[in-house]
């Protein structure tokens, strides 16, 4: 069960229905998804002025917003290439994003990011690295 205060949301079983049945699980997921979206994630994580690292997120906050996670990085001749993954809805399978890198086809789905001023287009969303990059 969720308990809301002005600053945070906490979970507990107090006054909640106990059990591991599907209906209870779906109610729990519904509550989590109501509060754990791209807008709250964007606010809770730290911004950075450095180039991305594995595990960092690109977040467009909103309702709906969108999030991609950096799952790998290659550096070749001083250029950083990144591999991204995302999911279209909470609790769906994660997919590796097809990169568009016509200059270096041998890097497959990896996308270059040269500076924090770069903007990259992923799955219909334009991410500004300086604005949208968040780190743990």
Where are these regions (language model features)?
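Acidic/His-rich structured neighborhood in mature extracellular/periplasmic domains
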Residues: 1-53, 59-67, 71-72, 80, ...
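Surface-exposed substrate-engagement region within the catalytic domains
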Residues: 76
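Low-complexity, Gly/Ser/Thr/Pro-rich intrinsically disordered linker/tail segments
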Residues: 83-136
């Amino acid at each position: 069960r969720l308990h809301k205060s002005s600053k945070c949301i906490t979970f507990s079983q107090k006054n909640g229905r106990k059990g591991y049945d599907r209906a209870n699980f779906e109610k729990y997921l519904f509550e989590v998804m109501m509060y754990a979206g791209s807008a709250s994630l964007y606010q809770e994580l730290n911004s950075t002025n450095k180039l991305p690292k594995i595990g960092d997120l690109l977040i467009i906050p909103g309702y709906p917003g969108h999030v991609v996670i950096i799952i790998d990085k290659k550096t070749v001749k001083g250029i950083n290439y990144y591999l991204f993954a995302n999911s279209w809805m909470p609790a769906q399978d994660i997919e590796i994003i097809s990169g568009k890198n016509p200059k270096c086809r041998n890097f497959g789905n990896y996308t270059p990011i040269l500076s924090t001023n770069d903007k990259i287009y992923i799955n219909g969303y334009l991410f500004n690295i300086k604005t949208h990059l968040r780190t743990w």
